[in-house]
Amino acid sequence: MPLPELVTDLVASRHAGGYKFRVQERVLRQFAEHCRRQGYPDGSITKEAVEGFLYGSHLRSSTIRRNELALRQLVEHAQGVGWDAYTPASATRVRLRHQPPYVLTDEEVRRLFTTIDFQPMSSFSNKALVDPALFRVLYGAGLRISEALNLRLPDVDSSAGTLRIRDSKNGQGRTIPITGRLAATLEAYTAAAHPAPEDSDYLFYSRAAGRPINQATTYMRFRGYLADAGIPHFTGGPHPHSLRHGFAVANLRRWVAGGADLATVLPYLACYMGHTDLRGTQYYLRLTADAYPEVIAKAQVRFGYVIPTPTQEQQ
């Protein structure tokens, strides 16, 4: 079996198990192409092939780690069908430096949305309509950027005040409540941006391209808004995903200030944000503690057991 077919077989098995496997598939296709260019024969995956692919380019340590994990799955699959395959190390040779997510301050959020809201209208682009609503969905509902860009018109129920998330990171959909203010924003946006719904079924779409907005475009626009708002952009700094972080931290701040039992409310936040377990949600407690120590200190005595301590890798 040629290596590209082996990759296809693995991808099919992961899809059958309910996994998206998109990023991993892209990595493994790149690895198969690397092996083809280097002339490695089918039937085996050598140490030379694996390490040349993983460590032969100047990649970020997090990217190397991601590629290692993808290749380990391919190697396991290859060994299962009788190939002689080298298993890459379980931990990257490059030290991973954890970069904590950036949380925008209240003032930065205010400046950012003021900038987004006052973009000039254009006959060539609908971004002045799209972006105020799109970025408010990220900040006001805590969606991942992929979830927001995959929203379709029927997924928004302004009268009920809900959003239906079809295409989630973990492959499981969910329906979430939204505030009346966000529901009204989306209702007004839909009326203005979709006067003829048949133009596009996607909630956020590019009028010029006639298709859904992609993540690269969203990121490029976000960087422009940061610059206009006087918010520095740097590695590990503000990113569209920072708005999702901001949603989580804002809710935790509100709950802590109100004396809520964090052990009770964390599962609700995890479900709302589409986390498969509490680990990701608990991490937002750490962010809240770091960014707003005066707020989180109120809960430390009663709920300190649910606030995770950074691991050595995170420190």
Give the positions of each predicted feature:
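Conserved catalytic core of the tyrosine transesterase superfamily
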Residues: 1-315
